[in-house]
């Protein structure tokens, strides 16, 4: 009897462990969500226009940010998120503490940390910033989203031009009400 109990307990713990370790599994966001760049955002704007994208998304992050890690492990790694964002935007990361030189939307060479702090007023991470095809920031979200659905809604909000007419809070409320119907 004790032997059966030990076997059942061992199997249960094995199943529990495998469930916990695979909870955030998905596609590597650095490979399947973010686009590669040489750091010339003026050139990336031209690429976005040429590819008929709605704009550019920049994910401002830093290494030891738990909310950035959450987004990369639970949202940006999901195939449906990757498919939607890759179809509609060019997506890039900027390290807010980085000393790597980049070229901003106007063609000025600057460091990542200066682009984040001085030009985009990033004080906390993550910041998800959307830019139109002329390089104007059109929407900004600070912090993690509540999950996959909210992040996709954020992209739809920008892609369909709703940001011109309503707040993202109202947009989400309308989406939730539509879901209930």
Mark where each language-model region is:
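Positively charged n-region of N-terminal signal peptides that target proteins for export
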Residues: 1-4
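Non-globular targeting/processing and membrane-anchoring segments
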Residues: 11, 19-40, 46-49, 121, ...
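Short active-site neighborhood of thiol/selenol oxidoreductases, capturing the structured segment around
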Residues: 51-66, 91
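C-type cytochrome heme c attachment motif
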Residues: 63-70, 126-129
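N-terminal cap/lid subdomain of alpha/beta-hydrolase-fold enzymes
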Residues: 71-77
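Glycan-processing catalytic domains of CAZymes
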Residues: 73, 94-98, 181
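Thioredoxin-like thiol-disulfide oxidoreductase module
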Residues: 79-164
């Amino acid at each position: 009897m004790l032997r059966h109990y030990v076997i059942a307990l061992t199997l249960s713990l094995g199943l529990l462990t495998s469930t916990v370790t695979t909870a955030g599994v998905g596609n590597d966001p650095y490979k399947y969500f973010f686009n590669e760049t040489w750091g010339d955002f003026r050139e990336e704007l031209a690429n976005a226009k040429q590819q008929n994208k709605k704009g550019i998304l920049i994910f401002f992050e830093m290494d030891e940010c738990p909310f950035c890690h959450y987004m990369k492990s639970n949202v940006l790694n999901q195939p449906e998120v990757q498919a939607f964002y890759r179809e509609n935007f060019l997506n890039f990361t900027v390290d807010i503490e980085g000393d790597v030189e980049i070229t901003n939307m106007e063609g000025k060479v600057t460091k990542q940390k200066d682009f984040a702090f001085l030009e985009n007023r990033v004080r906390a991470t993550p910041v998800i910033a959307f830019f139109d095809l002329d390089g104007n920031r059109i929407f900004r979200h600070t912090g993690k989203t509540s999950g996959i659905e909210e992040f996709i809604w954020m992209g739809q909000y920008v892609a369909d031009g709703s940001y011109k007419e309503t707040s993202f809070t109202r947009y989400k409320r309308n989406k939730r009400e539509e879901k209930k119907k």
